[in-house]
Amino acid sequence: MLRVPLCTPLPLLALLQLLGAAHGIYNVTQRTFKLDYSRDRFLKDGQPFRYISGSIHYFRIPRFYWEDRLLKMKMAGLNAIQMYVPWNFHEPQPGQYEFSGDRDVEHFIQLAHELGLLVILRPGPYICAEWDMGGLPAWLLEKQSIVLRSSDPDYLVAVDKWLAVLLPKMKPLLYQNGGPIITVQVENEYGSYFACDYDYLRFLVHRFRYHLGNDVILFTTDGASEKMLKCGTLQDLYATVDFGTGNNITQAFLVQRKFEPKGPLINSEFYTGWLDHWGKPHSTVKTKTLATSLYNLLARGANVNLYMFIGGTNFAYWNGANTPYEPQPTSYDYDAPLSEAGDLTKKYFALREVIQMFKEVPEGPIPPSTPKFAYGKVALRKFKTVAEALGILCPNGPVKSLYPLTFTQVKQYFGYVLYRTTLPQDCSNPKPIFSSPFNGVRDRAYVSVDGVPQGILDRNLMTALNIRGKAGATLDILVENMGRVNYGRFINDFKGLISNMTINSTVLTNWTVFPLNTEAMVRNHLWGREASDEGHLDGRSTSNSSDLILPTFYVGNFSIPSGIPDLPQDTFIQFPGWSKGQVWINGFNLGRYWPTMGPQKTLFVPRNILTTSAPNNITVLELEFAPCSEGTPELCTVEFVDTPVIS
């Protein structure tokens, strides 16, 4: 307890300062972060301030590695980080909130604070970020007519409930309240969206102010064009722009100045690389080009956020997609200064040298790249085909419907749904099956008749398929959700069979719809079990008409070598001879693999999901083709290597 001698008179202000310091509040109440319009800058505690920040997505990095990545950012000379909060990551079902483990956003922000990093918060509700549906939860689509990112009452009710949960958690973390959050973004690149709904923006401003107060700086970010800023910002929101090395810096900031004649120049997303799509080459930005452009930005006195400073991984099913439909791969490496695995790159050191020209960078050793280990090949054996495993994949039973139901109609938001019916006519001579009146396969469908693979229907390419079978034969269509569109007007991306299926002009009816809980099956039935000998060694049809297999689960185990210090270590898994599917290790969903499409050939395996105390389980769901058959089971292997392959 602070004791002030009564015989020593003190000025009232000095007494309040002592009392405030004793209770830990004085420094908090004096903390300020403001816009200085008169001199085109920020003021932090009354002193001129310029941030050089980097984007990091806690939801793409295991909690185990948060501190390592943040410390590397600090040592690069950054004084702030920028971060999104994806709504769907924290509210997977209406009213079901998750804020623990890898979802503990408050801990992540506190960790940044402890390391001396300020935080630029971007809580959405829409975030883009190449993340499924731009961070909006898929259950919003249960109201099929909903207009997302607008003043649609159904949307606003859901947004209001979410903000009432999230923003009160953020308020104690604001800079003026003793935390690290200096600015908060409202929405995200709203000027790129067709709605241009100012009532929606006003609603958000009102709710942000209600929950966070009037002292925090609220801002917007849009592409550096007048059209985008016209619809993307609003009075009382500070307008910023984003652009990469290919843009003219002067012209980009002239656009900002038309909306913000005074105040700091800000590039909220200065692109260090770019996103990838399956089937396209890996995107890169040359280090020299990036470093030169960063120097020019900083020489103008601009505040800069490097997007991304570390990309991370789209674990599980979290990747987004663009239109025309192009899903993003599991890796979100982004050619960033820190690699997907958190490794230091030439780009990291080049940017650090530039930053050092404008501000002091921390002294001391930079945390090294984490060691990697090649655990070698692991043999896998067949567990069951998807059709054989329906009893455990769909324990609550299927849903009956005259016509196909979408994923959201059966409350299956990610992964896979199996649609089953019977052929209404003889198809001994091949007849085409397709979706009518438009291609309603969302996104990729694996078709079989009486257990014989027929082929693949695809949202973009394979819109019709000839099938064979007798009248009354069982038709199975396994539909994969490959990631929802995260940008543009088509983010209301329904999944499954979203229109009727037709054979020879006959509409197929009387469907049995199986929502597949692959996560529960892997955790409860495959994790920790020995590789199974039941069934055939693979799911291949005996028919020679197709090289495809039935979608099949494969399992295997491997042990961490003994006698080697510091194991387990990070690694990468690759799939020689495999085609496309999903992989889990010890019940953790690493994401999608698709080496036949590329550019990503390996998946990052963080060491925190591995164990030395028991064999490590690998579960693979292969959808198209496995390298092994009954005669060559030794070919059914995956391999752990110490170097990523992305080209």
UniProtKB/Swiss-Prot annotation:
<dbReference type="GO" id="GO:0042803">
    <property type="term" value="F:protein homodimerization activity"/>
</dbReference>
<dbReference type="GO" id="GO:0016787">
    <property type="term" value="F:hydrolase activity"/>
</dbReference>
<feature type="binding site">
    <location>
        <position position="188"/>
    </location>
    <ligand>
        <name>substrate</name>
    </ligand>
</feature>
<keyword id="KW-0865">Zymogen</keyword>
<dbReference type="InterPro" id="IPR031330">
    <property type="entry name" value="Gly_Hdrlase_35_cat"/>
</dbReference>
<dbReference type="InterPro" id="IPR017853">
    <property type="entry name" value="Glycoside_hydrolase_SF"/>
</dbReference>
<feature type="glycosylation site" description="N-linked (GlcNAc...) asparagine">
    <location>
        <position position="510"/>
    </location>
</feature>
<keyword id="KW-0732">Signal</keyword>
<dbReference type="GO" id="GO:0005794">
    <property type="term" value="C:Golgi apparatus"/>
</dbReference>
<feature type="glycosylation site" description="N-linked (GlcNAc...) asparagine">
    <location>
        <position position="248"/>
    </location>
</feature>
<feature type="binding site">
    <location>
        <position position="84"/>
    </location>
    <ligand>
        <name>substrate</name>
    </ligand>
</feature>
<comment type="subunit">
    <text>Homodimer. May form higher multimers.</text>
</comment>
<feature type="glycosylation site" description="N-linked (GlcNAc...) asparagine">
    <location>
        <position position="504"/>
    </location>
</feature>
<dbReference type="GO" id="GO:0051413">
    <property type="term" value="P:response to cortisone"/>
</dbReference>
<feature type="disulfide bond">
    <location>
        <begin position="628"/>
        <end position="636"/>
    </location>
</feature>
<dbReference type="GO" id="GO:0004565">
    <property type="term" value="F:beta-galactosidase activity"/>
</dbReference>
<dbReference type="InterPro" id="IPR048913">
    <property type="entry name" value="BetaGal_gal-bd"/>
</dbReference>
<dbReference type="GO" id="GO:0005737">
    <property type="term" value="C:cytoplasm"/>
</dbReference>
<dbReference type="InterPro" id="IPR008979">
    <property type="entry name" value="Galactose-bd-like_sf"/>
</dbReference>
<dbReference type="Pfam" id="PF01301">
    <property type="entry name" value="Glyco_hydro_35"/>
</dbReference>
<feature type="glycosylation site" description="N-linked (GlcNAc...) asparagine">
    <location>
        <position position="500"/>
    </location>
</feature>
<dbReference type="GO" id="GO:0005615">
    <property type="term" value="C:extracellular space"/>
</dbReference>
<feature type="glycosylation site" description="N-linked (GlcNAc...) asparagine">
    <location>
        <position position="544"/>
    </location>
</feature>
<dbReference type="GO" id="GO:0006689">
    <property type="term" value="P:ganglioside catabolic process"/>
</dbReference>
<feature type="signal peptide">
    <location>
        <begin position="1"/>
        <end position="24"/>
    </location>
</feature>
<feature type="binding site">
    <location>
        <position position="130"/>
    </location>
    <ligand>
        <name>substrate</name>
    </ligand>
</feature>
<dbReference type="InterPro" id="IPR019801">
    <property type="entry name" value="Glyco_hydro_35_CS"/>
</dbReference>
<dbReference type="GO" id="GO:0005764">
    <property type="term" value="C:lysosome"/>
</dbReference>
<dbReference type="GO" id="GO:0016020">
    <property type="term" value="C:membrane"/>
</dbReference>
<feature type="active site" description="Nucleophile">
    <location>
        <position position="269"/>
    </location>
</feature>
<feature type="binding site">
    <location>
        <position position="334"/>
    </location>
    <ligand>
        <name>substrate</name>
    </ligand>
</feature>
<dbReference type="GO" id="GO:0016936">
    <property type="term" value="F:galactoside binding"/>
</dbReference>
<feature type="glycosylation site" description="N-linked (GlcNAc...) asparagine">
    <location>
        <position position="557"/>
    </location>
</feature>
<dbReference type="InterPro" id="IPR026283">
    <property type="entry name" value="B-gal_1-like"/>
</dbReference>
<comment type="similarity">
    <text>Belongs to the glycosyl hydrolase 35 family.</text>
</comment>
<feature type="active site" description="Proton donor">
    <location>
        <position position="189"/>
    </location>
</feature>
<dbReference type="Pfam" id="PF21317">
    <property type="entry name" value="BetaGal_ABD_1"/>
</dbReference>
<dbReference type="GO" id="GO:1904016">
    <property type="term" value="P:response to Thyroglobulin triiodothyronine"/>
</dbReference>
<dbReference type="Pfam" id="PF21467">
    <property type="entry name" value="BetaGal_gal-bd"/>
</dbReference>
<keyword id="KW-0326">Glycosidase</keyword>
<dbReference type="GO" id="GO:0006516">
    <property type="term" value="P:glycoprotein catabolic process"/>
</dbReference>
<comment type="function">
    <text>Cleaves beta-linked terminal galactosyl residues from gangliosides, glycoproteins, and glycosaminoglycans.</text>
</comment>
